[in-house]
Swiss-Prot record:
Its EC number is 2.4.2.7. Belongs to the purine/pyrimidine phosphoribosyltransferase family. Catalyzes a salvage reaction resulting in the formation of AMP, that is energically less costly than de novo synthesis. The keyword ATP-binding does not apply. The keyword Repressor does not apply. InterPro entries: Ade_phspho_trans (IPR005764), PRibTrfase_dom (IPR000836), PRTase-like (IPR029057), UPRTase/APRTase (IPR050054). One of its GO terms (molecular function) is AMP binding. It catalyses: AMP + diphosphate = 5-phospho-alpha-D-ribose 1-diphosphate + adenine. Signal peptide: none annotated. Homodimer. One of its GO terms (biological process) is purine ribonucleoside salvage. This is Adenine phosphoribosyltransferase. Pfam families: Pribosyltran.
Amino acid sequence: MTELVNITELLLSRIRDVRDYPEPGVVFKDITPLLADPAAFTALTGALAELTVRHGATKIVGLEARGFILGAPAAVQAGVGFIPVRKAGKLPGATLSQSYDLEYGSAEIEVHAEDLVAGDRVMVVDDVLATGGTAEASLQLIRRAGAEVAGVSVLMELGFLGGRARLEPALAGAPLEALLQI
């Protein structure tokens, strides 16, 4: 328990609140101070790697863009492959895509068609779970590729935005792990 409290305190101490960004009334959670601190960044990626191993994942999918920053070193530490899930049009070659609804419109994410296959167990990694739209689309994409969802791991969950409730049906019993609850 003490170790969990210590990592929680360390991570929280390195996340900066930026008021009125990107628009008035929003408090942006800036993780760049955490990334700049080798001890905090190592603790974070180590915790994500441990969750990856605990849930039997064979690959990590990192969601654009901060999921790349967190997921790649976690994959190295866990000894698993790393797969970037990008916004549509950013990957060369054959891709699988998944559209999802936003509050005002829609968006689309993609993965290389050959990167996920039957037998893969995939942990989705991102910095924040907010409304859950991108994470939900990534789970659909992973399953369409024939892979299995091992879980979703995030640095922080913004509980007041309801992402967990939205994601619950798509998880289909897979775990959602948030290192911090905001």
